[in-house]
Amino acid sequence: MALYEHVFLARQDISAQQVDALVEQYKGVIEANGGKVGRIENWGLKSLTYRIKKNRKAHYALMDIDAPAAAVHEMERQMRISEDVLRYMTIAVEKHEEGPSAMMQKRDRDDRPRRDGDRPERSFGDRDRGPRPDRGDREDRPRRPREDRV
């Protein structure tokens, strides 16, 4: 059996539970045709770069599949029929990645505290930083003439 990574985009107006139901439905199709589904990741609702079927956002989901080609073709056929699936892409891979995908790592990285989280809050008040001795005394400089505006 071949190894595949499969990503699909579901419509923005369905709930996260419905996305999970779609994943389970397609997992059932793969298993019914003699395959196995490994890692399943739900990347959540994300903005699209451009509109797809009048949608600006979509729910992203990733599945690692170990199945014969016929099982993948059947799953893709059902995705083409489904109104809830906007796009899908299946890629044959040599081996599945261990651990979370790059998208999940990025999401985890966003949750951690920032590097400067330890610093105290800066207070500039009215932004007065005091005299600037490198500029010299500006009191004796003549004022710039202003043009009369009409």
Curated annotation (Swiss-Prot):
Q: Name one GO biological process term.
A: translation
Superkingdom, natural source = Bacteria
Where are the annotated segments for Disordered?
94-150
GO molecular function annotations of the record: small ribosomal subunit rRNA binding; structural constituent of ribosome
**What are the alphabetically sorted keywords of the record?**
Ribonucleoprotein, Ribosomal protein, RNA-binding, rRNA-binding
Check the record and name the InterPro entries matching this protein.
Ribosomal_bS6, Ribosomal_bS6_sf, Ribosomal_S6_plastid/chlpt, Transl_elong_EF1B/ribsomal_bS6
Question: Cellular component GO terms, alphabetically?
Answer: cytosolic small ribosomal subunit
Q: Which family does it belong to?
A: Belongs to the bacterial ribosomal protein bS6 family.
PANTHER family per record:
MITOCHONDRIAL 28S RIBOSOMAL PROTEIN S6, SMALL RIBOSOMAL SUBUNIT PROTEIN BS6M
Query: Known HAMAP family for this protein?
Result: Ribosomal_bS6 (MF_00360)
According to its UniProt entry, the function of this protein is described as: Binds together with bS18 to 16S ribosomal RNA.
Instruction: Output this protein's name.
Output: Small ribosomal subunit protein bS6
Q: Identify the species of origin.
A: Rhizobium rhizogenes (strain K84 / ATCC BAA-868)
